[in-house]
């Protein structure tokens, strides 16, 4: 038999069924076999295989849904095993396969084929509710040879993005629809994947042409290149696991913009929790993470940023295990010069003492400042600038310049040895020295600056990456003095005197 073996030759003989489902571990899915065994004894339901509370409660949901759909609940002892038994199972994703396994083991449903899998949460009336993390589980299903995947209707567009030439995704609003489809009574039409098109990725982003004293950070995604399909899949996996995918949505096509409040904890930024959910650093992957009032964040929260800024990923470790999430984002931070906000203001007097200013600025550690490439001091906007300023360059015009520079970098990093590099920011220390070639005058300037400013090795490499990007925007092959001076100017703010 395809999906189960059911020896029922004698009264009281055990009945058994097994169905295929999937779970989540970190950013990826893993296969789970849902086994149902019905045997003699006092009526009872037992779920084993390291289930969490949501999985243990699924027995009550399945019992109610099965009865409300008109099926018979077996009046015997039922044991459900979720294999592999040494991996913790979380969430309500196993409700649908659990119900079908009970029906199959009790002889009310013929066994589904081995290459069929099921995901979905049950309501008490038998309707299906969407679940988190469908895309990574669907990708694992497609890679594991599954040909038919049944999911809640609201998850179908997302799951269909994992479809290849072999696997089909079938949307269902109720468990009854799944049963009828398996019986051949009422087939379900598969969901057709929507072609990937990031053309509208900038439609919701404010334009740079309107900027005059208004927030710049929120406009930054509007000048970044569109997401590649690989980046879109990775970003969608993160949002799906975090439960932040809109219903009926396929892939995320716009670069994320995240702006957490300064009261956010380190766990909110890094991620984690009982079920290992991505934090703000991962939700900003391939996009922008904006931290306003930077010194107001707790020291513990700010230090969380070190690993993702350096490695492009973040590892969350808890007693239940560990998970690594991609966290390659552009960090944009803003802060006042002091607590009252008027230190150095041309017309307003600062009310802070020197020690208060020193204490306020010291909340941002040196190692974190060392990882910030561009530091710019913003002056107050005058009245005449607000009312008489000429329009700024539009986001579309700026985007053309960015895309031209990215095209240069794409051609450069198409060479062997740069498979993991898409742009200058991703260069390793060794690659920086090979790629960032300088004129003799520029090299002499960098040597003098390194010794005079006491730069770290990390700052040295970051200056070269920024200078290389400035040169790309200008179409220069070698780093000259102008490119290097501009990059050094952006680093000058890290030498702001914090001790007076």
Model-derived features: where do they sit?
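Peripheral, non-AAA+ core regions of ATP-driven protein-machinery
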Residues: 2-215, 460, 477-500
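Alpha-helical scaffold elements adjacent to nucleotide-binding pockets in ATP/GTP-utilizing enzyme cores
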Residues: 61, 65, 98-101, 137-140, ...
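Short beta-strand elements
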Residues: 32-38, 269, 373-377
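Basic, amphipathic alpha-helical bundle interface domains used for macromolecular binding and assembly
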Residues: 54-59, 72-74, 81-91, 276, ...
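Short hydrophobic alpha-helical runs that function as membrane-insertion/retention elements
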Residues: 147-152, 168-172, 226, 289-291, ...
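Short glycine-centered helix-capping/turn motifs at secondary-structure transition points
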Residues: 106-108, 184, 243, 312, ...
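Proline-centered turn/helix-capping motifs that create local helix->coil transitions or kinks
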Residues: 110-111, 180-193, 228-229, 241-247, ...
